[in-house]
């Protein structure tokens, strides 16, 4: 409700009213993380993401949120290290390789960034992933390559380094 209306403060107030035992439910933690993320409250989002990982370790979303919180707190290497094993745990998720590509580029590991982005293209809709990547400042160093029509053709290269 409140979040869709663009009022994250009211959304947080509503979330504060939730009973303690319900506050650790994955759906509640997901909404709380979204509210904090949209409010740029990354320091507050991190413990919520950690609790979400404990509440729903079998889902990729908590791990993605945890990594994003770390990244937004300028802890990119920690985000990379957290998300890297999740690529194996959730092999069908294109978002995990995409985020790993972003983190690799920010860590100036461009070869890894290329390989992870190509893997994201293979797992997701390659054209949509490419459009998203060309609008993502985290991948700016790869933009000239991504614009090359052959970028998608090269997406059958070897798996990224683990």
Question: Predicted regions span which residues?
Answer:
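TPR/TPR-like alpha-solenoid repeats
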Residues: 1, 35, 69, 103, ...
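TPR/TPR-like (Sel1-like) alpha-helical repeat modules
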Residues: 105-106, 110-128, 153-158
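Alpha-helical segment of the N-proximal tetratricopeptide repeat
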Residues: 1-21, 27, 31-38
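Terminal, low-structured helical/coil segments at or just beyond the last alpha-helical repeat
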Residues: 127-162
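Amphipathic alpha-helical segments of tetratricopeptide repeats
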Residues: 20, 54, 88, 121-122
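Alpha-helical adaptor scaffolds
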Residues: 27-95, 103-108
């Amino acid at each position: 409700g409140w979040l869709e209306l663009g009022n994250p403060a009211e959304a947080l107030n509503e979330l504060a009213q939730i009973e303690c035992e319900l506050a650790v439910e994955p759906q509640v933690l997901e909404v709380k993380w979204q509210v904090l993320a949209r409010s740029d409250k990354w320091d507050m989002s991190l413990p919520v993401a950690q609790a979400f990982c404990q509440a729903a370790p079998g889902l990729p979303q908590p791990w993605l949120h945890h990594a994003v919180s770390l990244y937004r707190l300028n802890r990119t290497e920690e985000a990379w290290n957290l998300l890297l094993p999740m690529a194996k745990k959730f092999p069908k998720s294109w978002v995990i390789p995409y985020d790993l590509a972003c983190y690799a580029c920010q860590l100036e590991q461009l070869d890894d960034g290329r390989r992870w982005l190509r893997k994201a293209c293979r797992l997701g809709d390659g054209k949509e992933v490419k459009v998203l990547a060309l609008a993502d400042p985290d991948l700016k160093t790869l933009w000239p390559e991504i614009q090359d029509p052959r970028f998608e053709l090269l997406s059958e290269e070897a798996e990224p380094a683990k």
